[in-house]
Amino acid sequence: MEGVADFVLRDVLTRVGGYDGCVSEFVRVTGSLLPARTYERETPEIRNGGYTASGTPMVIQLLGSDPEWLARNAAQAATVSPHGIDLNFGCPAKVVNRHGGGAMLLATPELLHRIVSSVRAAVPAHIAVTAKMRLGVSDTSLAIACATALEEGGAASLVVHARTRDHGYRPPAHWDWIARIADAVHVPVVANGEVWTVDDWERCRAVSGCDDVMIGRGAVSDPFLALRIRGQMARAPSDAEWPLVLRCLVDYLKKLHARIAVHHEHGRVKLWLSYLKRTWPQAAELHAAIRRLQDSIEIQGVIENALAQPGRPGAANG
């Protein structure tokens, strides 16, 4: 989730807990060897052995279309990403696709195979190479061929987002297609797409036949979703949890402000609130209250006041 699930949000969400692991925003690979500072900036978890501050393993994800340069960069990334290297063949963004990256590669299973096999050969055997894919570019006609190409190229597991590139993020997600792919390959398949609630998670597992599910936008919309799935919090969100969300937002803002490399903190917080609106109506009120604010310290004050003084926009109930 480029522009959303950065290091700071990974830190906040994994501190909340419930996650087995997480994946970085994609690191774009073109025709050069990336400098070490790229990984230090995008994936600061490498300073902690590839773990978030709460101890959740993080895997570096690479995106590109050139087998040789992906392999060379993967070999370098593997020196600081001991939990694996993930390859992105699922991004539907036009700016990525126009350069032949992300989901556009699903039009050429042969190239998928070349990329994965090149990366697998370049990365030490004890470090897993995994891949994320969609069901295709405009249709599902090559879905099985793409999954097979990734497996035969050496991918240790596949995350399958249950929509095509052209489908974007519009519901529904076609979990039944994940089941077809899982039946066609012999590596573990992880289901992904349109999992917002515990009910969605249960249906996704039942339809896809997958034991494991990757949650993205669902985790951003409900920071406690992983805990709900594990039975460690109430199955459904409630107003009583809103103060916990506000504390997450304050923590997020403080961490954003502490990072020299992060700019436009106010935009990041507003973006997260736009996701939280799906789960909590109070998020819409808070978003409206800070919409015109540009200063992150001022925004933090509004959020802290909402936490301390019930009755203010976006305030905690009670």
State what each model feature region is.
Residues 22-24, 58-62, 85, 129-133, ...:
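Hydrophobic faces of well-ordered beta-strands that scaffold small-molecule active sites
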Residues 2, 8, 122-124, 128, ...:
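Alpha/beta catalytic cores of nucleotide-metabolism and tRNA/nucleoside-modifying enzymes
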Residues 37-39, 100-106, 233:
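Short glycine-enriched, charge-decorated loop/helix-capping segments at active-site entrances
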Residues 15, 72-85, 89-99, 110-187:
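Alpha/beta enzyme core
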Residues 105-109, 171, 238-242:
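Flexible, glycine- and charge-enriched loops at secondary-structure boundaries
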Residues 1, 27-29, 63-65, 90-92, ...:
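Active-site beta-loop-alpha junctions enriched in small/polar residues
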Residues 1-76:
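Glycine-rich, positively charged N-terminal anion/phosphate-binding segment
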Residues 32-34, 168, 222-228:
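Short, charged, surface-exposed secondary-structure boundary motifs
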